[in-house]
Amino acid sequence: MSKLTHIDDQGRARMVDVSEKPATAREAVAAGFVRMSAETLALAISGSGRKGDVRAVAELAGVMAAKKTSDLIPLCHPLALSKVEVAVEPADGGLSVTARVKTTGPTGVEMEALTAASVACLTIYDMLKAAEKGMVIEAVRLLEKTGGKSGDWKADQP
């Protein structure tokens, strides 16, 4: 098993020193899913929910969240993100969220992509909870990452 990079030899949490790492192109894609009834999905698609356009607001929330990742995850580095794209699309049984994040820097953007997808899912739940409290947020995961010392990685399909 690989050594955990955020734990020092004494078992204490630490922020990884990336000052000697070269700036390279990095990209990560994460996804999530909010399972809901057909009635709630129709409400989300129509854009006529009480709080407004669910998909547009969730996409914006995901973008904002990616930019705030280092404020939320204690050992994440603050990064200058060059692109954040969040898409919320209707799917069988709910809304599918995909977040794509890019940077050129010394560390990857996996956490930013995961944070964007997670917060977009939470925003969907918040905006539709008046219609259905039993929605389920599921399958939040990293789909792929490119760049960096560890190279490219892609998740096995579902």
From Swiss-Prot:
It is an enzyme of class 4 (lyase). Coiled coil: none annotated. One of its GO terms (molecular function) is cyclic pyranopterin monophosphate synthase activity. It comes from the Bacteria. Keywords: Lyase, Molybdenum cofactor biosynthesis. The keyword Lyase applies. GO terms for biological process: Mo-molybdopterin cofactor biosynthetic process. Homohexamer; trimer of dimers. Catalyzes the conversion of (8S)-3',8-cyclo-7,8-dihydroguanosine 5'-triphosphate to cyclic pyranopterin monophosphate (cPMP). HAMAP family: MoaC_B. NCBIfam families: moaC (TIGR00581), PRK09364.1 (NF006870). Belongs to the MoaC family. This is Cyclic pyranopterin monophosphate synthase. It comes from Caulobacter vibrioides (strain NA1000 / CB15N). The lineage of its organism: Bacteria, Pseudomonadati, Pseudomonadota, Alphaproteobacteria, Caulobacterales.
